[in-house]
């Protein structure tokens, strides 16, 4: 791997790619594409699982940029699996239905009424909107939930969170079938148990479990932060590369804390199950996934086993 060491300012200079187009000539554009070739070859015919959430789902321009990027990746032969959340859309619908949203340790407390809304919004609204948008970009996608094809079998996480699921088994057959037909599987994080009960699953947990089961080349988590920071108030302290053996020390130092702990725990488990690399990137930056996967420098934090 090329050493991931450069100033974060370089990344944010590239944030406005739509404005840069006015300032570079065709030869420079061609050179940018040519520089991506080794990275395209590295990931071609390999599987990349993308966890999609945060502000990139709310902002229409960012959403369009993400879907366009995913279509580009599939066009050059990379197998993309999109796993999405939908917290803001769920909150909005619950508010309309006058159902109170409650959270415990960063997870939504999900009673029977709430899980019905979660299923309706994630599988019926958010999922289909993403499939439609990919289609409008010239791509091909199929919307799935963790209940389809016996994909994600769960049991209740604990007694406190209600119908929040802990994944016990991932069946990748339907995902692989969709990928083999050059479609993007767009997966909403709804699972089920042996009794047929429906469960809400944390999107980070689901994406990591799916990536591990697929033995994916990479797991990419799009977030509302630039990556893992030594000082959470200073973006210039971005840590570019982390080995999973280092994570206990980073937790002890408080560098990994709060809601970042379960996210990185999930990534660590995926790496142990055979995923080659995992990334946390800033979904607020247009084309961040292309910058991470198709440039020498990357832009977020990369996690590896060794």
Language model features by range: what are they?
Residues 13-284, 291, 295-297, 304-306:
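Nucleotide/pyrophosphate-binding catalytic subdomain
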Residues 1-15:
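Single conserved hydrophobic/aromatic residue that forms the stacking wall/gate
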